[in-house]
Amino acid sequence: QTNAASDNKKNGRSSTSVTLTQSANYPEAYKDEIMKTIRTVENDETNDSISYIFITDMHIDTSEETREVAYNQLYAIVDIANNSDIDFVCVGGDMYNGRYADPNGKVIAMDTIESISKILELCNKPVFILKGNHDDNSFSAQINEDLLFDADHIINREEWYSITMKHFSQYATDYQNGYYYYDIPGKNTRVVCLNMSDSDDTVTDGKQNQMGMYFYGYQNEQIDWLLNDAMSRDNCNYIFLCHDAFDYPEGYSTESNRDTLRAIMAAAYTHTPFAANSFAKDFTNWSGNVLLYHSGHLHMERAVFDSETGGLPLLNTQTSMFSVQSRGWMQDKGYYMDSGRQKGTATEALFDVVVARKDDINIVRFGVGDDYSLKKK
């Protein structure tokens, strides 16, 4: 264990000594970065802010080096979470590549994902895990095409829950198929976790009806739940978390409800009526307030007030994966990707700590890259 004192004070809160219980599990070079992150977040926080850690697209089985750096980052997250006043930790999906085609491939895949959950159980804060398009192991069919829709290799919804949010069930209110919400105590804020890989796992003759490699999107049941259950709390702030947002259409069909979700977000943020397909909700007198929508998937970084979504603050965190194979999926609209990651130093890491208030969002970078902000003028 490593102890370090900090005497920062903010709004009458004084930071106590910092105890890095996981310091044996990441490089020595992380320690200064952890202390800097804790202090920066503490200085940014106010009584009306929400703060959280967001790490995404780890793809930890890309190489042994990638896996090692991913675990380093997860243990660092534990120490930051446990020595700060952040409100929660979110894993944004695509935790691995989902290509285990061995006869026991599903077991290997589930063990890989659950190893992440087990580390994050060391956090004394809520943990939310989002499902990405790679996470059901259906990309095993890229290794062996005979495994297309093969239920023996694809992680179904019950199995997904057992290796992810079952470990954090107290933070998964009204859990459905990878989507759920949580009300942050004392903060008048509801966090809504969505599932862009909401595939139908009905099995017929050994074949699953849909799978993550081919189905991107939100079933009608999820949209109905979002409108009538998740967004039903009055007079509170809302944060939406999902593996993907709206800028990269590849993988989505016309039945994916992707555009429906975007229209809901725009209407909720601007307090205007929404109607699309068979869904409708008049947000004109809705008493909720949408703070932001945060995602990954593109392996690129960006924070904007998105004009195509009614001016909604959209945050996109780039991939935390340490690999020469790492690349981004958007080359326009202001997306970017940090370079210069160096193994064995803090720059091998990359995740964001967000401190959010209405129209005022600070993004604190752990690892390579710089802190930045999104503020309405």
Model segments located where?
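Sec-dependent signal peptide cleavage junction
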Residues: Q1-D7
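N-terminal active-site segment of His-dependent metallophosphoesterases
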Residues: G12-K106
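Extended active-site neighborhood of metal-dependent phosphoesterases/phosphodiesterases
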Residues: Y30-T37, A101-W225, S307-N316, S320-Q342, ...
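Active-site environment of divalent metal-dependent phosphoester hydrolases
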Residues: D61-E64, N97-Y100, K131-A141, S199-T204, ...
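Active-site-proximal segments of metal-dependent phosphoesterases and phosphodiesterases across multiple
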Residues: G105-M110, D200-D224, M231-L292
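Conserved beta-sheet core of the metallophosphoesterase superfamily
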Residues: S253-R357
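Short, solvent-exposed aromatic-acidic interface loops
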Residues: R365-K375
